[in-house]
């Protein structure tokens, strides 16, 4: 079967990605209205309720009647990862197709987008609670950087991709190596080589660096004026800690530090 025939059999999907403040949100809405699409957020922080200012979350009135998926679906004390995103995004895409619409994936979390596009198999190994507890205790006693250096020794690619403060992900990568003797980064890379089940169009937005920096600085000023510090305090009161997944977003962890 030729490439054109294969593409014709696949369902269409559009991806809009790019750096912060480049204009993904506005363009995604314009495009959705023009082609009859619905938007799937690929932002790892906008899934959380009560985190509106620091995530620059789109407001209801800004959606302009376009349905948005994977926004405000979890409490900030809940974990969210690529496996969960993949399952939810797949379901959202099928829901959109069922109405004869086209999914538009918008956001800046590249690994999440790849997980959806290439149907990556995140093999779930048996949990080793003893190992996890040992790693958690090590992080608590000696600091997150100790675990991160341990990961760097066995899987430098994963260490490069995972921030040291994201202790849960660091431990999962170490656990995968402990259980299988293989690097989880190698497993994920092999999965990314798969053929996509979608006929997708992938657009990376960009603009002049000076303009982009000016927009980012303006956005930060607006966030502070709108009450970002108070938002973080409220999240702390709800039980969010420095190592909570929801607190790994830019702005939140800096204020907590």
Q: Can you describe what each PLM-predicted range is?
A:
Residues 1-257:
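Phosphate/pyrophosphate-binding catalytic cores of soluble transferases and nucleic-acid-acting enzymes
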